[in-house]
Amino acid sequence: MSTSDYKDDPGLTGKVAIVAGGGAAGDGIGNGRGAALLLARSGTKVLIVDRDPKLAARTVELITAEGGTAAWHSADLTNEVQCRDTVTSALDRFGRLDFLDNNVGISSRASVVEEDPDTWHRVIQVNLDPIFFLSKYGIPAMIKTAGRGAIVNISSISAIRPRRLTAYTTAKGAIIALTRAMAVDHAPEGIRVNCVAPGPVYTPMVYAGGMTDNARDQRRRASPLGIEGTGWDIGGAVRFLLSDHARYITGQTLVVDGGVSIMSPNRESEEHDRPKA
């Protein structure tokens, strides 16, 4: 083995990606939009999929304004037929499929005692069904048109460090398990499957809820780095895991949280009680 054996090329140029949940309000950078923009900047052709066509179309506008190649497709990704049609749309437009980035998800703030059964089922459905259906039809398309492929599923640090989000935590934990199962099942076919677990990131979905400056400051202080994450941070992790730079990585969960998950839950009170010099 010599230095010439390694090619410093991420292998993204000319490839095709489906980014599920690639829309975002206005010009904000959500996890999916961040990944889509970064992939397009690396030469990947991107199909932006969102239930709201206006949000998907805006992501396409942002990509094409930078000289990238993208198209949008509106779909309810909890519906199997619409997921199948999404994969067909990517093949019809771009002729191949290499990557799948699954960002779709919703949350609910309740304990198991408080949770409404209908909400429980809906949270599980929206977080898991799009991954299942898009992978069901996407993996055969990758094998047929590209000979290999890569998938990134978006989980959450809530799956690692649970909070009062029982349905969401359960769904995101299941995504990690599903990722590992898919990685084992499809490795012989050249398909890598990994997971990104975001921590507190400031995205359009978050600030649409009216997060206060004080709440944002608390989030920053929860990180040992003292900073807040963005959709760009998650998008960068997705791009890495889809690239050839991650060719030897599969079945793994990359935690992108500024170190929040390695800290004691009582860090703030501990710091408050620490003697001052």
Predicted regions and their residues:
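Alpha-helical segment proximal to the catalytic Tyr-Lys
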Residues: P140, V184-P188, R247
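Substrate-binding pocket helix/loop in short-chain dehydrogenase/reductase
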Residues: S111-V112, D116-I124, R219
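Catalytic loop of short-chain dehydrogenase/reductase
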Residues: V152-A174, T179-P188
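Active-site loop of short-chain dehydrogenase/reductase
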Residues: K15, G68-W72, R96-L97, M142-S155, ...
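Short C-terminal tail/terminal secondary-structure segment
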Residues: S2-D9, R239, T250-A277
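C-terminal helical subdomain
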Residues: D8, C195, N214-H245, I249, ...
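Canonical Rossmann dinucleotide-binding motif of NAD(H)/NADP(H)-dependent dehydrogenases/reductases
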Residues: P10-L47
